[in-house]
C-alpha cells in the first residue's frame, strides 16, 4: 500500500528549515503528563534532524476543545527539554512570535510551537488542497524547505497540519511513521492466520469501522470486546445494562451507534464475542455479575472473571493478536483486572502481538506486559484502520505530494 513512500533517507537536511509534525498527545491529569511514551518515541527523529544540522520547528497537538486535557504544550516541552539540547518552547503557532523564532533558528536548533489545535481550522477534516489555502499553511510554509510528518497516531485524520503542507513543500515521513508502516503493512500483506482482535476503550466510531472490516477478513477468527465498546454491543445484543451505564453511553452520544452494532452482531455472530459477565462499581467495590443478572443500579466498570478466562483461551490459540483500548476503567483500583489479565495473556502467548493507543500502552507498562509485546504502536485508531485495510489520509498526502523528492 505504501511501499514507495518518501522517507528521511530521500532528503538532505543540512542547513534546511524543517517543519516536523509529531503526535505527542498524552494523558494529562491536573496539568501533568501521566505517560511520556509518545514524546520519547519521537526523540529519535528529532535528534537525527539535529545531527544533520537542520533548523527544526515542531507542530503538535494536545487534546480536543472542551476536554480537560486540551492544554498548552508547556508540560510536553518540559519533558523534551530534559532530552534535547538547543531546544525551546514557543507559545505561538503562526503569529509574529513564532515567525520571528523560526527565522532566527540556527543549524541544529529546535523549537516546539504551541498546540496546533488552538487554531480552529486545524480541526476540520478536508482534502490537502483545501487545507493548503488556509491560514496555518499559508503563513508557515514559506518559512520552510521540507515538511516531515512523523505523526502516525494522527495519520487517519485529514487536518491542516497533517496534509496541507504536502501541497506547499517537499514532504516525507519521519522514523516513527516509517517503522509503523513497515510493521503494519507486513502484517496486512502476510495475512497472519488465526487473528484475534481485542477491542476496548471508548472510541466507538473507530471500533465500529474496524469490527466491520475484521469480520470480513478471512484471517480474523475472533473479535473480543470490552470497555465502552463492549458495553454498547452488549446493549445492542439485547442486554439491559441498567440505568447508570445506559445514561453514560447516551451522554457520550454513543447510542446513535446501536443500530450499527446490532447489524455487526448479526453479520459476525460467529466472530464477535461480547462479555458473558461484568464487574459493577458498587460504591467503589467490585461486584461481578453474569450478564443475564442485569440490569443493575450500578455502572459496569470492567469485564468479569468468566469473560477474562474465555478471552485468555482465544488469545492463547491465536497466531496474531491486535489489541486497542482497555477492557474497563483500569485506572480505578479494583477494576484493572480485566485489562491487566488480558494484556498478560497476550504477552504470554506465542502469537505475534501488537497493541496501540495511549491507554492500553500505559496499562501494559503498569501490569508488566509491555516488554513482551512484539510491536507497540503509537497509534490507536490509525493502527486499527491500517490493519483493517483502510488508507490513511496523512500518508496518502505524502504519496501524492507534487514536489521532487516526495
Curated annotation (Swiss-Prot):
The protein's enzyme class: transferase
Assigned EC number: 2.7.2.3
Catalytic activity, as annotated: (2R)-3-phosphoglycerate + ATP = (2R)-3-phospho-glyceroyl phosphate + ADP
Keyword entries, A-Z: ATP-binding, Cytoplasm, Glycolysis, Kinase, Nucleotide-binding, Transferase
UniProt: substrate binding residues: 23-25, 38, 61-64, 117, 157
Keyword ATP-binding attributed: yes
Pfam families linked to this entry: PGK
Keyword Transferase: yes
Complex formation: Monomer.
HAMAP family listed in its UniProt record: Phosphoglyc_kinase
Protein name per the record: Phosphoglycerate kinase
The species this protein was found in: Methanopyrus kandleri (strain AV19 / DSM 6324 / JCM 9639 / NBRC 100938)
Amino acid at each position: 500500500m505504501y511501499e514507495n513512500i518518501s522517507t528521511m533517507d530521500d532528503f538532505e537536511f543540512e542547513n534546511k528549515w524543517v517543519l516536523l509534525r509529531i503526535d505527542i498527545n498524552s494523558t494529562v491529569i491536573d496539568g501533568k503528563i501521566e505517560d511520556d511514551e509518545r514524546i520519547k518515541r519521537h526523540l529519535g527523529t528529532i535528534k537525527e534532524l539535529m545531527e544533520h544540522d537542520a533548523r527544526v520547528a515542531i507542530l503538535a497537538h494536545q487534546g480536543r476543545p472542551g476536554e480537560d486535557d486540551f492544554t498548552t504544550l508547556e508540560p510536553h516541552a518540559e519533558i523534551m527539554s530534559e532530552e534535547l539540547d538547543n531546544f525551546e518552547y514557543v507559545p505561538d503557532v503562526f503569529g509574529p512570535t513564532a515567525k520571528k523564532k523560526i527565522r532566527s533558528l540556527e543549524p541544529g536548533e529546535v523549537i516546539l510551537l504551541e498546540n496546533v489545535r488552538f487554531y480552529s481550522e486545524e480541526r476540520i477534516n478536508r482534502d490537502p488542497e483545501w487545507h493548503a489555502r488556509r491560514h496555518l499553511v499559508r503563513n508557515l510554509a514559506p518559512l520552510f524547505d521540507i515538511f516531515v510528518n512523523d505523526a502516525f497516531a494522527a495519520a487517519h485524520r485529514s487536518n491542516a497540519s497533517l496534509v496541507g503542507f504536502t501541497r506547499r513543500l517537499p514532504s516525507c515521513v519521519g522514523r516513527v511513521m516509517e517503522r509503523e508502516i513497515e510493521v503494519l503493512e507486513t502484517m496486512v500483506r502476510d495475512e497472519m492466520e488465526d487473528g484475534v482482535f481485542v477491542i476496548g476503550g471508548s472510541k466507538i466510531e473507530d471500533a465500529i469501522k474496524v469490527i466491520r472490516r475484521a469480520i470480513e477478513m478471512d484471517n480474523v477468527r475472533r473479535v473480543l470486546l470490552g470497555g465502552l465498546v463492549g458495553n454498547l454491543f452488549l446493549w445492542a445484543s439485547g442486554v439491559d445494562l441498567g440505568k447508570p451505564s445506559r445514561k453514560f453511553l447516551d451522554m457520550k452520544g454513543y447510542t446513535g451507534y446501536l443500530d450499527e452494532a446490532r447489524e455487526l452482531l448479526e453479520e459476525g455472530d460467529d466472530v464477535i464475542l461480547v462479555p458473558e459477565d461484568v464487574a459493577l462499581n458498587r460504591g467503589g467495590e467490585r461486584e461481578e455479575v453474569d450478564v443475564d443478572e442485569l440490569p443493575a443500579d450500578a455502572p459496569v466498570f470492567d469485564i468479569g472473571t468468566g469473560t477474562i478466562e474465555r478471552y485468555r483461551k482465544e488469545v492463547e490459540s491465536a497466531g496474531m493478536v491486535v489489541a486497542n483500548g482497555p477492557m474497563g476503567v483500569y485506572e480505578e483500583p479494583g477494576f484493572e483486572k480485566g485489562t491487566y489479565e488480558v494484556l498478560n495473556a497476550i504477552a504470554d502467548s506465542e502469537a505475534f502481538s501488537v497493541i496501540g493507543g495511549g491507554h492500553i500502552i500505559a496499562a501494559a507498562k503498569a501490569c508488566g506486559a509491555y516488554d513482551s509485546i512484539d510491536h507497540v504502536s503509537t497509534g490507536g485508531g490509525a493502527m486499527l484502520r491500517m490493519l483493517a485495510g483502510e488508507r490513511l489520509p496523512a500518508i496518502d498526502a505524502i504519496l501524492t505530494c507534487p514536489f521532487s523528492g516526495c
